[in-house]
Amino acid sequence: MSISSLSRKNIQALTPYQSARRLGGKGDIWLNANEYPTSPDFNLTHRTFNRYPEPQPQAVIEGYANYVGVTPENVLVSRGGDESIELIIRAFCEAEDSILYCPPTYGMYAVSAETCGIALKTVPLTADFQLNLPEIERQLTGVKVVFVCSPNNPTGTLVNRTDLLALLEMTRNKAIVVVDEAYIEFCPQATMVTELKNYPHLAIIRTLSKAFALAGLRCGFTLANKDLIEVLQKVIAPYPLPVPVADLAAQALQPAGLQAMQQRVQEILQNRTALEADLRSLPCVENVFQSDGNYLLVKFKDGQKIFKTLWDQGIILRNQHSALMLENCIRITIGTAEENRRVIEAIRKIA
């Protein structure tokens, strides 16, 4: 008997999420994980490594609450946004329940549900990467949690606000709606935070991994009404944030840290505009999809060839060819101006 055969049946059948690091690669240009290209500079100020950390570090909770304009009771901090996804599924889904999500989108919604033994329902996005609301409404029976990513990863599109409000109305008293705003700093006007007061079943996922350039910290947040946060507090690990992580996260949420984040956002937006224009000039490019994130989804005439050739040159992008509706598509994280120049130069040589 193998050890694997002793594991739960759903785990035996599970295909793990293929993160950028799991997929590997060797090179000096990494534009496959929607990270910021350089690291911010912080120094540890707390060195009480012999003591367990605060269950919910006050400086982090208050700093993030002030940043987004809510009260501390509306904030839960976790080990990245991925833990928020799993917490919500564990806290709200019974064995007979389902989650619903809309591909092509972030893969961890499905993986987290499958890990917990929860069934999946999918309603693909429309041709313009928006919600298919009539079909979602038809599929809601037995659904306890609906996940929507806006801006959506990997397409970069914002979900129409009117559609999100319609979704919240049709799920009232039926299901939790989770809006994943991992990339919202690149389009802050689109946040759903102002709707928390109107919808007790709305949860919003945030992170320090993208615009804050702190992917290595693994620090995320759930924003929701007090009652929903209290449910999640029942199932979260006792000490989710190590002392060094809480220390650096709190610094990032101070005025100087927020100003640096906003400067990074402006830099990324400028580089995104330039990269988009350069990509559109290439004959091998069929489409560059409009993006509100720190990445571009690009459809090539032969995406597989482009991806493999650049991979072999040490330029690591994210292949989306196998994702629903994304044949020959590659997602390109916005890098430095020099990194973007090298991407264009490499693609131009192939074409």
Curated annotation (Swiss-Prot):
Catalytic reactions of this protein: L-histidinol phosphate + 2-oxoglutarate = 3-(imidazol-4-yl)-2-oxopropyl phosphate + L-glutamate
EC numbers: 2.6.1.9
Residues annotated with N6-(pyridoxal phosphate)lysine modification: 210
SUPFAM superfamilies listed in its UniProt record: PLP-dependent transferases
Gene3D superfamilies from the UniProt entry: Aspartate Aminotransferase, domain 1, Type I PLP-dependent aspartate aminotransferase-like (Major domain)
GO molecular-function term, one example from the UniProt record: histidinol-phosphate transaminase activity
Keyword field contains Amino-acid biosynthesis: yes
One Pfam assignment: Aminotran_1_2
GO biological process, one term: L-histidine biosynthetic process
Pathway(s) served: Amino-acid biosynthesis; L-histidine biosynthesis; L-histidine from 5-phospho-alpha-D-ribose 1-diphosphate: step 7/9
Cofactor annotation: pyridoxal 5'-phosphate
Keywords of this entry: Amino-acid biosynthesis, Aminotransferase, Histidine biosynthesis, Pyridoxal phosphate, Transferase
Subunit note: Homodimer.
Homology family: Belongs to the class-II pyridoxal-phosphate-dependent aminotransferase family. Histidinol-phosphate aminotransferase subfamily.
Protein name in UniProt: Histidinol-phosphate aminotransferase 1
Organism: Pasteurella multocida (strain Pm70)
